[in-house]
C-alpha cells in the first residue's frame, strides 16, 4: 500500500471510530476529514505506521500500524492524561525497588 492511500485509510478509520464511540457529551459533533491530522508517519518495506490526532475535545491519540504481509491494520487508541517537565538536573539515575 502506498503512503498516500494509507494516510487516507487511517483518517477514515479514525473518523469511523470517533463517530461510533464518542462521549455522550459529544453526541452533536460529527468528525470530518479536516479534523484529523498526521503527527508522524513512517514506511519500511511493505509496512506502515502513523501517529494521528484530531481537533476533537476528547484528547485521544491514535497509532495505526499496517502489516503488509497480512494486509491488515492494528489500531491503538490512547488518552493523554498529563504532560509535565522534568529538568535534567532533577533526573534520578538510581534504580529504585
Walk through the language-model features, giving the residues of each.
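N-terminal trafficking/processing presequences and adjacent post-cleavage segments
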Residues: 1-22
